[in-house]
Amino acid sequence: MSDVIMVNTEYIPGKRIVKVFGTIWGITVRSRGLGGNLVAGLRSLAGGEIKEYTKMLSDARNTAMERLQSAAEQIGANAVINVRFDSSDIGQVMTEIVAYGTAVLVEDVTDNIQRVGLS
């Protein structure tokens, strides 16, 4: 399991950004294949969720996130902020999933600042 922190916010509570590496991404392209497209096409006639595509896209999203974490580790980042996803179709049988964000190096905040919480 990776120690890279991944968040969709601009900061991480309790951490301070000490270095910004820049934008990084993890990409995967998936194809359902002829048999899967045929089954999904038949299911789409009846309406409702097409579970074959849902699983494929969920797996692709997880792969893109794993590749994003790996890209962060390779450049020495220990966190990725502003994580986002994008997808696009390539032709009629392939889908590209991209996970991207800003790779940063963070450290714990050790200031003697008293934090006031909301109650």
From Swiss-Prot:
Gene3D superfamilies: Hypothetical protein apc22750. Chain B. This is UPF0145 protein Ta0182. Belongs to the UPF0145 family. It comes from Thermoplasma acidophilum (strain ATCC 25905 / DSM 1728 / JCM 9062 / NBRC 15155 / AMRC-C165). Pfam families: YbjQ_1. It comes from the Archaea. InterPro entries: UPF0145_dom_sf (IPR035439), UPF0145_YbjQ-like (IPR002765).
